């Protein structure tokens, strides 16, 4: 699943090619991706209007329309956007939504797993959307701070990895970066959140910010299928210290890295650097 750095990278790419282009038509090839609207309503909202800005909240992509409406997209497991210039040849296999622009260009939403979602909101609905309002701050928000995370964590019986994956505690972090953050912090992912002290939360939060910033600079992590445009992959996979390295030696202590399931998530651990407490 694309995490914060991947979503941020997608948005940067989208802003470079689709802003201020009036929409001619929207074609939807799988109705279930539209969660609170339908094809007619979507066309009524978008045709003759343009995307004037694209923002992020957690892992959500927010298309801001020239008429004041908002189209909110979540990529889920395998969602991707591909921009196609006028006259280009492309395959519509796995394309669920086509945004056709009046200048002949188009933006395709591609999703092999078909888990992605779209919500159409007016301003009132957007400001009161449960999907968005339940999200916590993410590590790149200016107001993100370890004291607030500690205040939640010291009351929680969840394992710390499960705790930081919960988007109502910290948004934007997924499985890959959770492993990297906890390894950098030398904290075992099965340690209970309530058993960590304030300084450990400070370490988690600082590492989260540093790692996600670096991953954004590297245009995300490509493990599997992530691309931010056709034939362009991220680069942070070359900087991963622990995720995906089962059976390899820890770069810090040469201990063999193990993999185990924690609440259904494959988790990579150095049992010497990350002692369970």
Swiss-Prot record:
The reaction(s) this protein catalyses: Hydrolysis of DNA containing ring-opened 7-methylguanine residues, releasing 2,6-diamino-4-hydroxy-5-(N-methyl)formamidopyrimidine; 2'-deoxyribonucleotide-(2'-deoxyribose 5'-phosphate)-2'-deoxyribonucleotide-DNA = a 3'-end 2'-deoxyribonucleotide-(2,3-dehydro-2,3-deoxyribose 5'-phosphate)-DNA + a 5'-end 5'-phospho-2'-deoxyribonucleoside-DNA + H(+)
A single GO molecular function term of this UniProt record: class I DNA-(apurinic or apyrimidinic site) endonuclease activity
InterPro entries assigned to the protein according to its UniProt record, in alphabetical order: DNA_glyclase/AP_lyase_DNA-bd, DNA_glyclase_Znf_dom_DNA_BS, Formamido-pyr_DNA_Glyclase, FPG_cat, MutM-like_N-ter, Ribosomal_uS13-like_H2TH, Znf_DNA_glyclase/AP_lyase
Gene Ontology biological process terms, A to Z: base-excision repair
Tree of life domain: Bacteria
Signal sequence extent: none
Necessary cofactors: Zn(2+)
Protein EC: 3.2.2.23, 4.2.99.18
Residue sites binding DNA per the record: 94, 113
Keyword Transport: no
Summary of subunit composition and partner proteins: Monomer.
Role: Involved in base excision repair of DNA damaged by oxidation or by mutagenic agents. Acts as a DNA glycosylase that recognizes and removes damaged bases. Has a preference for oxidized purines, such as 7,8-dihydro-8-oxoguanine (8-oxoG). Has AP (apurinic/apyrimidinic) lyase activity and introduces nicks in the DNA strand. Cleaves the DNA backbone by beta-delta elimination to generate a single-strand break at the site of the removed base with both 3'- and 5'-phosphates.
Protein name as annotated: Formamidopyrimidine-DNA glycosylase
Organism: Mycoplasma pneumoniae (strain ATCC 29342 / M129 / Subtype 1)
